Amino acid sequence: MDAKGVWEMPLSTILVEDSPTIRENLIPAMAELADVQVIAIAETASEALLALEKYGEDWDLAVVDLFLKSGSGLTILRACQTRGSHQHAVVLTNYPTSEMRRRCLELGADAVFDKSSELDAFFEHCNSARTQARNQPRGTER
């Protein structure tokens, strides 16, 4: 609980990332720097779609890599288009070309970050998403 007696819940997150090394480093960093709790990990587009379906309104943040073992992160962004207003979808990629950023944003990504140079901005966005999720009623679509 915070000083006002409000329960501070971590940001329930679905992580779509096929690299074990990146996951091993990213998960503890997200927990420490942005109060993120990873509730599901997906290495493929089909695993991510199952996680989105399983958790429905109960996730707050989807962190999506674009190039997966099988399938594309763009598929996940399409599936997130009807997400609730409290839910955020961000792309964390090694290929943040201007064209790829444009495509991701057109598909409804809230933001696109370069894994190699924009992690500080990514963590700031996670903190902002956590604040918004706590203040946004669940069950309303974007």
Which sequence ranges carry the predicted segments?
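Conserved acidic carboxylate
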Residues: 17
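Two-component/phosphorelay signaling modules centered on CheY-like receiver
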Residues: 20-40
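Acidic, metal-coordinating helix/loop segments flanking the phosphotransfer/catalytic sites
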Residues: 41-61
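Acidic catalytic/metal-coordinating carboxylates
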Residues: 44, 72-75
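Active-site residues of response regulator receiver
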Residues: 65-66
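Short amphipathic alpha-helix used as the core "switch/output" element in two-component signaling
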Residues: 74-85
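Alpha4 helix (beta4-alpha4-beta5 surface) of REC/receiver domains from two-component response regulators
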Residues: 96-113, 117
